[in-house]
Amino acid sequence: MTQNLKSFKPADNSRLFSNDPGFQELLSFVCDEREADRLTSVLTAWEKKLPAWNDLSNEAARPEKLPRVEKYDRVGNRLEKVVFPPETKTIRREVVEAGIFSNQSEVEKFAKIYLLAQIGEGGVTCPLACTDGLIRVVQALGSDFLKKEYLPKLLSAEYPLSGAQFITEQSGGSDVGAIEGTARENKDGSWAITAEKWYCSAYDEFFCLAARPDGSPEGTRGVAIFFVPRLIDGKPNNLSIRRLKNKLGTQSLPTAEVDFEGSKGWLIGKKEDGFYNLMNYILNVSRIHNAANSLALHRRAFVEALNYAGQRVAFGSCLIDFPLIQQSLLSVLAALTARRGLFFSLLAGIDKQGLLPEEREQRLWQRFLINLMKYRTAFQLTGMVKEAILVFGANGIIEDFSILPRLLRDSLIVETWEGPHNVLCLQILRDVGRFDFFSRFKKEIGRIVQSWPAGTLDESRKIYLNAVKKAEELFTKERPADKVWVQTHARRIVDHLADLLEIGGLVRQGITQKNNRLLILAAHLTHESFRGPLAGFENPVIKNLPQFGLDLVSEKPVKGDLKGF
């Protein structure tokens, strides 16, 4: 404990995996024992690289180091490139060399990303997401030429994390069918793409562009996707950078406005399947990455707040001993634990079924979970980082005291990436109407209830079952076709369904692992989510914080009788 800040010790970023017991428990839950042991070994080695990357990330975020456009070389030849700080280039190269594309499972890949993204470097994690999506679509649908000429470069440390995806134009962003960029086929089978791309994050060497081939219909049915390199024969590929956007956050990540003026590219997949392929191979993968990044920023914010609260003394007591501080930490930890649990359960399912399983219901359920996780991990992220900042008081808003001010700015950007909240919720409800969602959801809830025996969190179980009943009453099979109802209540019902799945997952894990801490977090969320704005007055977790609050928010084992929970 410290009254004087001169003896304050920053949070330890050298053991982001080893000091995350909740994440270790989760991996043991979603993986078998042998795989969990293997992942522990892999991630223990991975975490040792993070302190150096964290230091490089902090240096790259300095205002004088931010990316800049270099349009010409010293004798006036066009370059049309973005110059990155050497620290960013070093992290990217070392991340590839360390094996970010060499994994035995999706759980392994995104466990690495969850730890990596805690350094708060959007200039690495965004291009990683874009490059991953571009690799997957070229592997699945690319021509032999693309696989031979460009796939090795996308995977290499020579061109580290150099992929990007440019969809948005002034005419449309989330409304992909409104884009106006065109593509004309050349005699050699390549295409000439002309487009004014308005939001080009991670501009580097290789791009996936959405454009409309000549003669294609309007709307999304006429959109195709193309592979476009920055350079052809060492010269700029008929493209021009207008400027880099002056964004609120992720300032170390260049986001450009780019004019493509007959740029040479190659069709990826069939042109009539362009929108389908864009959604399934590019946007879905980016949304998975976005969820992992959101969880990482959420975790880093919690770690920073917990570390500060455990040292800072005010009014004669350590901050962490104050009930209101414990409640702040509890709110951040509970939301993180629940959403992280559902996210890694999704990844474990992808490992079993594959991304885009052949069976239609499985594929649509997977897409439902991907969209749900992108939305749920991001929609309160800014609020969670702000809650962590407020634990610091005025020290929380000082740029060089902690990473939190940068995380706050970046969190708002992460919320907007790959579909704002309203768009995602409406997409979720459109997808619900395309398969027997209600039977599948009922099956998932049934598994939760069946594994939740009487005598365990009885009060919470009663509240949970009532919330299930309420969902069945509000969200009937007829609702997805009611456009007015959907447009009005999309976010409310999606949040309610998500609460049921996230809390239920916590209960199942807590029961399976005999983990009181997880069960208490589940009880807390049950009361807070389903009992209304005054739930805290009757919430048994809040009432019992004097008994176990310190252990709970410190992620230590919690002992005791949970009767009345």
Which sequence ranges carry the predicted segments?
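A short core secondary-structure module
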Residues: 190, 194-238
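Glycine-rich phosphate/cofactor-binding loops in nucleotide/flavin-utilizing enzymes
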Residues: 3-25, 394-461, 529-565
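A glycine-rich, basic-preceded beta-loop-alpha segment at the flavin cofactor/substrate interface
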Residues: 234-236, 242, 257-286, 303-320, ...
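C-terminal amphipathic alpha-helical interaction region
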Residues: 451-565
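Extended, charge-enriched "interface" segments that sit outside catalytic cores
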Residues: 1-103, 558-565
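C-terminal helix-coil-helix/basic helical segment that borders enzyme active sites and/or dimer interfaces
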Residues: 337-376, 390-392, 476-488, 508-511
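Flexible glycine/proline-rich, aromatic-decorated loop/lid segments
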Residues: 250-280, 394-418
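Internal helix-loop-helix
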Residues: 65-152, 156-159, 200-202, 340, ...
